[in-house]
Design a protein with these regions (language model features):
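Solvent-exposed loop and capping/linker segments of extracellular ligand-binding repeat ectodomains
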Residues: 1-297
């Protein structure tokens, strides 16, 4: 039914006999007149592994807590509700989907999405990627422990980019010690005012992050006023902080040892470009970084 823009309703029992179906990817994508779906639509489809983009671009405003409860073989739950109308989802929506490996762009660009329950991903221990998870939503806050049981995640790229969050809990990434990238994770969070010093260190991903894991990390966070000491401590393999604070127009102070342990860094391209409130750089902020070759921008 992809792009069926005149479809207004999904009838009860539509897939009751689709017991051998393995995927419903893109099934109702861009059916922008659909505002609701039967709670038991997929109850008999116990073999499906993918629901990627299932309701992307629809006008669904709520989803039943048990909607995916019988789809225990699901692995791909990416882009399900992107470009939609949801404001939130039930905490136990994915409680029975223990094999899911990707939630990429789950709510991306759903501007109405405002809140996420703390236990939404509590029963999804196999997840590998949350790339662009909430990107472009109106998410206002991040509950503590949101990723507490997702220790296999490698990708948080752009996960919270362009959201309305004002702060993040110190334990947000705690225990996620297989992360390879945080790139652009908070890019464009224009209301983000502060970040805790333990934010990245609590993950323990010191040996798994890629060389460019922090590029664009706080780019265009226009309300961020300060950076805590020790924020990047321990990440000795990182070689670039390109655009890390580019466009942080409210940033006024930096800790002297911000990059003290990042001794492999070679590039700081545009790292403080557009930081119009930053009047001075503390002595020694770049001390000991003998491998740096680029300060352009």
């Amino acid at each position: 039914f992809t792009d069926c823009r005149v479809l207004e309703a999904v009838p009860d029992g539509l897939f009751d006999h689709a017991t051998e179906a393995e995927t419903f990817a893109y099934c109702f994508q861009n059916c922008n007149m659909v505002t609701e779906v039967p709670a038991d639509l997929l109850y008999n489809c116990t073999k499906i592994t993918s629901v990627g983009s299932l309701f992307s671009g629809t006008a669904i405003t709520q989803i039943d807590e048990d909607f995916f409860s019988r789809n225990t073989e699901l692995t791909d739950c990416s882009i399900i509700f992107s470009n939609g109308k949801l404001k939130t989802v039930p905490e136990k929506l994915f409680a029975n989907n223990k094999k899911v490996t990707t939630f990429n762009s789950l709510f991306a660009n759903t501007e109405s999405f405002e809140s996420v329950p703390a236990g939404l991903f509590a029963n999804n221990p196999e997840v590998d990627s949350f790339r662009m998870l909430f990107s472009g939503t109106s998410l206002k806050s991040v509950p503590a422990g949101l990723f507490a049981n997702n220790h296999k995640v490698t990708n948080f790229q752009s996960a919270f980019s362009k959201t309305a969050i004002q702060s993040v809990p110190a334990d947000l990434f705690a225990g996620c010690d297989k992360v390879t990238t945080f790139m652009s994770c908070f890019t464009g969070c224009s209301e983000l005012q502060s970040v805790p010093a333990e934010l990245f260190k609590s993950s323990g991903a010191f040996t798994t992050v890629t060389k460019t894991a922090f590029n664009n990390i706080f780019k265009d966070c226009t309300s961020l006023t300060e950076v805590p000491a020790g924020l990047f401590d321990g990440f000795t393999l990182v070689t670039a902080f390109n655009d890390a604070f580019n466009g942080c127009a409210s940033l006024t102070t930096l800790p002297a040892g911000l990059f003290a342990t990042n001794t492999a860094v070679t590039s700081f391209t545009n790292v403080f470009k557009g930081c119009t409130s930053l009047k001075s750089i503390p002595e020694g902020v770049l001390g000991g970084l003998s491998k740096v070759t680029s300060f352009s921008g």
